[in-house]
C-alpha cells in the first residue's frame, strides 16, 4: 500500500500544498450507472442524476461500504486552473480583516457585488468560519499556509509529529487521466490508523485561498484507502474518515439525506477532494 504519511517540514509542506492547489479537484458523486453494474450491490444510498445539482453533495458513504471489494461510482471533476484564487502569505493575509462583520468592507476591497454569486459565497465562508465549534469539536479557518500549519499544530499536535495526508490519482501516463464517471473498487483492505487525531481542511470559496479546518476530539476513525477504477488504469490513494458519533450534528446535515439514514442515528464516512488537506497526529 502506498503510504500517504510523512513528517512535515515547512518547505516541503509549501511545495506539497502549492502543487495540490494547481492540480485537479475531486468530487465524489453517487450516481446510478447501469443495472448490470449495480447487480449484487447494495445501492440503496445511491442517487440518480440530477437529484442534487451540486456534485460535492455526493462525498459520503456508509461505514459498511468500507471493505475490500466494495464498488462505488465516483466522479472526478477537473478543476479550472484559471479559477484558482491567489495564495497569500501570512503577512499579506493578516493585513485583511476576516470576519462577517467586515463583509461590506471586504466586498468593496475585492470589488465584488453583494448579490453576486461570489459575494454570497464570501458571506457563507465568513459565516462558517465565525461559527463557534459545537461540543466536542475543534475548528478554525486558515487564511495562509503558515497560519494553517501553526493552528493545526496548536490544535492536535502539541509536541507530537504533525503529518499530512492528501488524495492522489495515480496513472501510468498523465494523459490517460479520465474525469468521467467511473466505478471504483476498494483494491485493498482499508487500513485504519489507530489512535489518530485528525483535522480535515477544505478549501472554501473566497477571493484568496482559505481553508476551513475541523475535527472531533473523539469518535473519529481514519483510514488509508486504495480505489481502483474498473478499467484498471486509475488508482486513487487517499484518506477516508468515519465520524462514529453524529448525535450532535445538525439534523438537516446533507449527509443524512445522501445516505438516506435517520438523522444522528449512524456513522457517516467520506472521502476528500484532491485539494483538501488532512492533518493527523498521534
UniProtKB/Swiss-Prot annotation:
Going by the UniProt record, its keywords in alphabetical order are:
Signal, Vacuole
Cell location: Protein storage vacuole
Domain spans labelled BURP: 60-282
Segment forming the signal sequence = 1-26
Q: Which Pfam families match?
A: BURP
Q: Name one GO cellular component term.
A: protein storage vacuole
Q: In which tissues is it expressed?
A: Expressed in the radicle and cotyledon of germinating seeds 2 days post-imbibition (DPI), in stems and roots of 30-DPI young plants and in floral buds, but not in fully open flowers or leaves. Expressed in the embryo and seed coat tissues of developing seeds. The protein accumulates only in seeds and only long after transcript accumulation becomes evident.
Q: What superkingdom does the record give?
A: Eukaryota
Q: What's noted about domains in the record?
A: The BURP domain located at the C-terminus has not been identified in non-plant proteins.
For this entry, the protein name equals: BURP domain-containing protein BNM2A
Taxonomic source organism: Brassica napus
Amino acid at each position: 500500500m502506498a503510504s500517504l504519511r510523512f513528517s512535515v517540514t515547512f518547505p516541503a509542506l509549501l511545495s506539497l500544498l502549492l502543487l495540490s492547489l494547481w492540480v485537479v479537484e475531486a468530487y465524489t458523486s453517487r450516481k446510478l450507472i447501469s443495472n448490470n453494474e449495480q447487480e449484487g450491490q447494495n445501492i440503496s444510498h445511491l442517487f440518480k442524476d440530477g437529484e442534487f445539482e451540486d456534485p460535492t453533495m455526493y462525498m459520503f458513504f456508509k461505514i459498511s461500504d468500507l471493505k475490500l471489494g466494495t464498488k462505488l461510482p465516483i466522479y472526478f471533476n477537473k478543476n479550472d486552473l484559471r479559477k484558482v484564487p491567489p495564495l497569500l502569505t501570512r503577512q499579506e493575509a493578516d493585513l485583511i480583516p476576516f470576519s462577517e462583520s467586515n463583509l461590506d468592507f471586504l466586498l468593496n476591497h475585492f470589488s465584488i457585488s453583494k448579490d453576486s454569486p461570489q459575494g454570497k459565497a464570501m458571506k457563507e465562508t465568513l459565516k462558517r468560519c465565525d461559527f463557534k465549534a459545537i461540543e466536542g469539536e475543534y475548528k478554525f479557518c486558515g487564511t495562509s499556509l503558515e497560519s494553517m500549519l501553526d493552528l493545526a499544530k496548536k490544535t492536535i499536535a502539541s509536541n507530537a509529529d504533525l503529518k499530512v495526508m492528501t488524495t492522489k490519482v495515480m496513472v501510468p501516463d498523465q494523459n490517460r487521466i479520465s474525469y468521467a464517471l467511473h466505478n471504483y473498487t476498494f483494491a485493498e483492505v482499508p487500513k485504519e490508523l489507530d489512535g489518530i487525531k485528525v483535522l480535515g481542511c477544505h478549501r472554501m470559496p473566497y477571493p484568496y485561498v482559505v481553508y476551513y479546518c475541523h475535527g472531533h476530539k473523539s469518535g473519529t476513525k481514519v483510514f488509508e484507502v486504495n480505489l481502483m477504477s474498473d478499467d484498471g488504469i486509475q488508482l486513487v490513494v487517499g484518506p477516508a474518515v468515519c465520524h462514529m458519533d453524529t448525535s450532535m450534528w445538525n439534523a438537516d446535515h446533507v449527509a443524512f439525506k445522501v445516505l438516506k439514514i435517520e438523522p444522528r442515528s449512524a456513522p457517516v464516512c467520506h472521502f476528500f477532494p484532491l485539494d483538501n488537506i488532512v492533518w493527523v497526529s498521534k
